[in-house]
């Protein structure tokens, strides 16, 4: 069975490696990925995608593109004569591309569809306090993330999982599911299920605006928001007119004598860096001030001497 694989970030690499390991059953004829990205520095070489690096290491032919609608790309896919196209964290493909696969084209999505359709399912699942997540394979169709579900696998979202940790877990779970899906397609035993839109939810693209911390929320909500964006792109706020990224923060449960109730207020208490939410205090455990390296909250607290009631800026 001839396979074309399409993916770009680290999330897609385990799936690529799992397909490659099944070389006695599947023929991986082409790997498609995004173009190399320029690095900072005058003469710095461009940076290949994680999928490109892995594919070259494994000895596969790689085609780079940022334009999946071009006639050149369509010709490359058609010339590969794929039985199946596997997509993992790539671009939205036009029907002219995925229609080239004789047995179908499917996508690996990092949620339990129809929940969290969109660009950032891992982040929004944690932000919304979900206790369970998973991966889905589904056949591509014109409307994004709405195709018939082939297979799903679930895992719990643990209290200490952030977006980076959960992404690694789901990438490996997804790699197993991709191989199971390919075996089912090859055997002709695929059974699909239409998505029930009654359970639909969105996972929109992360932006500068929707990753800003709004401190006038309960501390449990704030904690989930912060871990849902860690380590990249990271939740952010401003303090003394400078941006600060916050990677980890937990509800502070010890007794505090302070009478401060204004959300966003800072308190350095017993060497800890605390910020007021709407219903209590949040201890900032890991952060990165603008222009500095990431550090522990306690380290920042030792050198930070705000006036009583100094507030982080928030809207």
From Swiss-Prot:
It catalyses: L-methionyl-tRNA(fMet) + (6R)-10-formyltetrahydrofolate = N-formyl-L-methionyl-tRNA(fMet) + (6S)-5,6,7,8-tetrahydrofolate + H(+). Keywords: Protein biosynthesis, Transferase. Signal peptide: none annotated. Its EC number is 2.1.2.9. (6S)-5,6,7,8-tetrahydrofolate binds at residues 111-114. It holds the Pfam family Formyl_trans_N. InterPro entries: Fmt, Formyl_trans_C, Formyl_transf_N, Formyl_transf_N_sf, Formyl_transferase-like_C_sf, Met-tRNA-FMT_C, Met-tRNA-FMT_N. GO terms for molecular function: methionyl-tRNA formyltransferase activity. GO terms for cellular component: cytosol. The keyword Transferase applies. Gene3D superfamilies: 3.40.50.12230. Attaches a formyl group to the free amino group of methionyl-tRNA(fMet). The formyl group appears to play a dual role in the initiator identity of N-formylmethionyl-tRNA by promoting its recognition by IF2 and preventing the misappropriation of this tRNA by the elongation apparatus. Belongs to the Fmt family. This is Methionyl-tRNA formyltransferase. It comes from Chlorobium phaeobacteroides (strain DSM 266 / SMG 266 / 2430).
């Amino acid at each position: 069975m001839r396979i074309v694989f399409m993916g770009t970030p680290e999330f897609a690499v385990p799936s690529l490696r799992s397909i490659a390991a099944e070389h006695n059953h599947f023929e991986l004829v082409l790997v498609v990925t995004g173009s190399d990205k320029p690095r900072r520095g005058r003469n710095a070489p461009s940076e290949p995608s994680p999928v490109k690096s892995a594919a070259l290491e494994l000895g596969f032919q790689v085609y780079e593109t940022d334009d999946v609608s071009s006639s050149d790309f369509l010709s490359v896919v058609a010339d590969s004569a794929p039985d199946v196209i596997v997509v993992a964290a790539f671009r939205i493909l036009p029907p002219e591309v995925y229609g080239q696969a004789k047995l179908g084209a499917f996508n690996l999505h990092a949620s339990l569809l129809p929940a969290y359709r969109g660009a950032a399912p891992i982040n929004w699942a944690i932000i919304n306090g979900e206790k369970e997540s998973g991966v889905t394979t589904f056949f591509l169709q014109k409307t994004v993330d709405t195709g018939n579900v082939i297979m799903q696998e679930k895992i719990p979202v643990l209290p200490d999982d952030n977006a980076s940790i959960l992404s690694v877990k789901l990438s490996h779970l997804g790699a197993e599911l991709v191989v199971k899906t390919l075996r089912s397609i090859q055997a002709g035993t695929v059974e699909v299920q239409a998505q029930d839109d009654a359970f639909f939810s969105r996972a929109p693209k992360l932006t500068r605006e929707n990753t800003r911390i709004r401190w006038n929320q309960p501390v449990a909500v704030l904690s989930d928001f912060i871990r849902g964006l860690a380590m990249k792109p990271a939740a952010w706020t401003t303090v003394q007119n400078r941006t600060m990224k916050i990677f980890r923060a937990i509800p502070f449960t010890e007794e505090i004598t302070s009478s401060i109730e204004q959300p966003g207020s800072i308190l350095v208490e017993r060497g800890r860096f605390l910020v007021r939410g709407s219903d209590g205090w949040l201890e900032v455990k890991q952060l990165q001030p603008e222009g500095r390296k990431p550090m522990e909250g306690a380290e920042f607290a030792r050198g930070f001497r705000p006036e009583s009631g100094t507030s982080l800026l928030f809207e």
